Every structure is written in structure tokens, then in C-alpha cells.
Amino acid sequence: MTRVHPELLEAQQLPKPLVSKHIWRDRFEDIRAIERYLTRQGTVIRKIFLNVSKAEQRRRFLVRLRNPAKRWKFSVNDVNERLRWKQYMAAYEEAISATTTVEAPWYIVPADNKWFTRLAVAQILIDALDDLNLHVPELSCREQRALHHAQRRLRAT
């Protein structure tokens, strides 16, 4: 599981030669290429965007500010970043659209109600595991005889 905070990405200082008008197109292409490589190697990728509404984000921020045990989760900069809500939503939409593939799909999960979010994410993971069609390997007759022999030897010692 990887968790990325957008404000950290934005604050990232990029070397000047990397900054071009095509930087995001190039990065999205690289993300798709890396994910394509990983899925060819057998890695299962499921990307989940937890979509918290602006109203719910505000409510959670106020709860954090009222509760001393939760204040560490809040940054004063969060208030400034909320002013750019539309820009963040547009950036998320662009990134998700540009990097979703059959092999590495995005799932956008409503996240205002934590119980529902957890249930939806659990179902996505269960479905991904089911798709692996995992099963206990069948033992050949020779392997079964070897195990039986090993069992007899263990009992004798």
C-alpha cells in the first residue's frame, strides 16, 4: 500500500531540466510503463482513490482541531490548500484518467462514511484475490508417499 499526499507532491522541488510543458504527460506515460512491467511480472495492482467531499474534509479538520490527540493530523496549510479544491479535483481526475488501465485500474471510493469506505476497499481487495484463482497445490503420488515416509520417520524419533 502506498499513500501519497498531494501537498507533498506539489512542494517537491524538481530539477530544472525535468520541468517542461509535457512533464505530466511524460510522468503519466512512465507510470503506465512501470505498472505494465510490474503486472507482466505477476504483481497485482489496484489503485484506490478515497474521495472525501469538501464538506466532510472540513468536518474532519474541525474535529482534529477540537481534539488535542488528533491535532498532529492537521496542518495550518490545510486551510490554504482547501482554497484550491477545484484545482486538486481537476488534477486528480487528470491523473486517474491518464493512468488507469485494464491491468492496473483505479477505483474511486466515496470516503465520507468510513464504514462504507472500509467495506468497499475490502471488497476490491477480495475480488483481486479471488481473480488470482489460488488453490492448494495437488501432491503427486510420489510426493504423498514421501510425506508418509517422513511422517513415519518423525514418529520413530
Language model regions located:
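Conserved alpha-helical scaffold flanking the Walker A/P-loop in AAA+ ATPase domains
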Residues: 29-37, 93-96
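Arginine/glycine-rich "motif VI" loop of SF2 helicases in the C-terminal RecA-like domain
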Residues: 37-41, 98-101
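A glycine- and Lys/Arg-enriched "phosphate-lid" helix/loop adjacent to the NTP-binding pocket
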Residues: 2-28, 38-90, 137-144
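Functionally constrained cores in energy, signaling, and assembly domains
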Residues: 43-46, 57, 95, 118, ...
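NTP-dependent small-molecule kinase module
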Residues: 90, 97-157
